[in-house]
């Protein structure tokens, strides 16, 4: 999913400078061919970033790659699209003040078409607005929903999955 979200950013956001990292570097190569810069490590990927977007396999990966190594620089907005539980979202929001949970609802087809559902959750109105503007690249405008907490975004995502 992360590849498709990054591809939408490259195609929809004029002038974006996008740095990507993947544990399996070959998986990031198509994005490099489309204009992204490949980082050798997560630390290199976030260096000088204005916004950091993660799309990982699950909450344990979020802890390992982002939270435990304290990857997010102070003041930098972190938008995480990983599917996590409400308790995980609360944990990440407590660990990183700039955390915005923005899980996506849908499969690769809607992702390629920019028609995903997205819940964007944070109590910070400015960060929520920023994240929603970015998520417009991969979201269906009628399914882009801002909520006031990371946990509420996680709940919305889980309920949407039940309806599928």
Where do the model's predicted regions map?
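Generic structural signal for conserved hydrophobic packing positions in ordered secondary structure
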Residues: 1, 62, 78-79, 131
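NAD(P)+-binding Rossmann beta1-loop-alpha1 motif at the extreme N-terminus of oxidoreductases
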Residues: 1-54, 81-82, 91, 108-111, ...
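Short, hinge-like loop/turn segments at secondary-structure boundaries
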Residues: 35-39, 55, 72, 116-121, ...
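Alpha-helix C-terminal capping/helix-to-coil transition sites in glycosyltransferase folds
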Residues: 47-48, 74, 115
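Glycine/threonine-rich flexible loop motifs
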Residues: 56-68
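Rossmann-fold dinucleotide-binding core
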Residues: 67, 84-162
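Short, conserved loop/helix-junction motifs that constitute active-site signature segments
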Residues: 69-75
């Amino acid at each position: 999913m992360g590849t498709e979200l990054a591809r939408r950013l490259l195609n929809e956001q004029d002038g974006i400078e996008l740095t990507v990292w993947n544990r399996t570097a070959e998986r990031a190569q198509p994005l490099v061919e489309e204009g992204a810069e490949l980082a050798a490590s997560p630390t290199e990927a976030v260096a000088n970033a204005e916004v950091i977007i993660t799309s990982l396999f699950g909450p344990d990966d979020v802890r390992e790659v982002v939270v435990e190594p304290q990857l997010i620089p102070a003041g930098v907005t972190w938008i995480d699209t990983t599917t996590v539980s409400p308790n995980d979202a609360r944990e990440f929001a407590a660990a990183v003040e700039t955390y915005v949970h923005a899980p996506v609802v849908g499969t690769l087809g809607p992702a390629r078409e920019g028609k995903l559902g997205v819940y964007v959750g944070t109590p910070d109105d400015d960060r929520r607005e920023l994240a929603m503007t970015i998520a417009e690249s991969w979201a269906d405008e009628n399914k882009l929903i801002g909520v006031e907490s990371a946990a509420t975004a996680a709940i919305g995502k889980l309920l949407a999955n039940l309806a599928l």
